C-alpha cells in the first residue's frame, strides 16, 4: 500500500507477449460481487506474493490464464531492480491486458498485484505472513470480474494494468511505485514519438474490498484539475446507483500509483481507495476482512461508468 517515498529503479527492459484468444461471445448480466470474492480468495490461496518471489510468478501465470480465457490480449512488461539488501537483481513484471486493442484512444484501469514483504505495522508480528487480501488482491479481483464484460464495452478501448513492485520495501527510505513509475516512463517516451495508445484517463483500484467500505474522494485526485472531472463522473454514477459507500467529499491525501501515472505519464488518474482500514499492513489483512458486497459495489460503479464513456471523435 501507498506511502510517500523517493523513486529509484535500475531497469532492464524485457517485454513478453502472451497472446489471448477471441473475445467471449455472450456478455453477462451484471457484475457479481460473489465471483469477485471467489477471485480474491483464489489469489490469496497463492500465499504472500512479494515482488520477485515464486508465489508472484505463480500468481502472474494464474492471472494471465484468467484474462486470456476472458478474451484479453495479455502481455508482460518486465524489468529488473536491485535488491537494496543484497544488491542482487530482482525480476519485476507489470501485467497488461488489452481489450479492443485496435482502438487508439483508451481508458486505463489499474491495480497493484504485489504484496508487501512483511506486515510491518503489525504490533505483534511485524515479520509475519502478509497475505494482502485487501491491500493487493481486492483491486485485482475486481478487474478479474470486470473482464467478463469487456468484449461488450463500446467507446474507447480499455487496458488493465497490474503493477508489480508497488511496495517492494524493507526499510524506511526504500522506493515505492516502481512498476507504475516504469510503466509511466515507457508510456511518456512513446507519446513523445506519437506512438502507441493514447489514454483518455485512468482509474486506480486499491484497497476496495473492506467489509466496512467507505470510499472518500482522494485529495490529490480532486485537487488536480485534469483529474477532478474523472472523480466527479465516477461519484455521480455511484450516487445514481445508490452506492452510498462512495462518499462525495475529500478525506485522505495519498501517495499511490496514480501519482507517477499523472506526473510522469500525464494520464489523469483517479485513486479509488478505502484508506480507513485497521488491518492495513498487518497479519490480519485476510479474506475475512473483505466482503463480496463491497467488491460488488465497487465493480458495479466502475462497470456502469465505463459503459457511459463516449466514443472517441472520428478523425
Give residue spans per PLM region.
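Active-site-adjacent substrate-binding region
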Residues: 55, 76-78, 82, 208-315
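Acidic/histidine-rich catalytic neighborhood of metal-dependent amide-processing enzymes
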Residues: 127-226, 250, 257-258
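Boundary at the C-terminal end of the N-terminal hydrophobic targeting segment
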Residues: 22-28
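Bacterial N-terminal signal peptides
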Residues: 8-19
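Structural recognition of the beta-strand scaffold that forms the well-ordered cores
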Residues: 96, 107-110, 159-162, 200-206, ...
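A non-catalytic alpha/beta surface segment that caps or lines the substrate-entry region
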Residues: 38-102
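Stable alpha-helical elements in mature extracytoplasmic
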Residues: 32-40, 55, 59-66, 136-142, ...
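Acidic/histidine-rich, surface-exposed loop or edge segments in extracytoplasmic proteins
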Residues: 36-49, 212-216, 282-283
Amino acid at each position: 500500500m501507498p506511502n510517500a517515498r523517493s523513486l529509484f529503479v535500475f531497469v532492464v527492459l524485457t517485454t513478453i507477449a502472451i497472446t489471448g484468444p477471441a473475445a467471449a461471445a455472450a456478455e453477462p448480466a451484471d457484475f457479481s460481487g460473489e465471483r469477485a470474492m471467489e477471485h480474491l480468495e483464489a489469489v490469496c490461496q497463492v500465499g504472500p506474493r512479494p515482488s520477485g518471489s515464486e508465489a508472484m510468478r505463480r500468481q502472474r501465470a494464474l492471472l494471465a490464464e484468467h484474462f486470456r480465457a476472458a478474451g484479453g490480449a495479455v502481455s508482460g512488461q518486465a524489468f529488473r531492480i536491485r535488491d537494496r539488501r543484497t544488491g542482487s537483481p530482482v525480476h519485476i513484471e507489470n501485467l497488461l491486458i488489452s481489450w479492443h486493442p485496435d482502438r487508439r484512444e483508451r481508458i486505463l484501469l489499474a491495480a497493484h498485484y504485489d504484496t508487501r514483504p512483511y506486515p510491518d505495522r503489525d504490533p505483534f508480528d511485524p515479520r509475519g505472513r502478509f497475505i494482502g487480501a485487501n491491500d493487493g488482491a481486492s483491486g485485482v479481483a475486481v478487474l478479474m470480474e470486470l473482464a467478463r464484460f469487456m468484449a461488450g464495452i463500446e467507446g474507447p478501448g480499455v487496458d488493465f494494468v497490474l503493477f508489480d513492485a508497488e511496495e517492494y520495501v524493507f526499510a524506511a527510505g526504500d522506493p515505492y511505485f516502481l512498476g507504475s513509475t516504469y510503466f509511466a516512463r515507457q508510456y511518456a517516451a512513446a507519446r513523445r514519438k506519437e506512438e502507441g495508445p493514447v489514454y483518455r484517463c485512468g482509474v486506480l483500484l486499491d484497497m476496495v474490498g473492506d467489509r466496512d467500505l467507505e470510499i472518500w474522494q482522494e485529495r490529490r485526485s480532486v485537487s488536480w484539475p485534469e483529474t477532478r472531472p474523472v472523480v466527479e463522473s465516477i461519484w455521480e454514477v455511484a450516487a445514481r446507483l445508490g452506492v452510498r459507500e462512495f462518499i462525495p467529499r475529500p478525506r485522505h491525501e495519498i501517495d499511490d500509483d496514480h501519482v507517477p501515472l499523472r506526473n510522469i505519464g500525464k494520464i489523469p488518474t483517479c485513486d479509488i481507495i478505502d484508506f480507513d482500514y485497521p488491518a492495513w499492513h498487518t497479519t490480519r489483512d485476510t479474506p475475512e476482512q473483505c466482503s463480496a458486497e463491497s467488491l460488488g459495489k465497487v465493480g458495479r460503479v466502475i462497470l456502469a461508468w465505463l459503459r457511459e464513456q463516449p466514443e472517441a471523435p472520428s478523425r
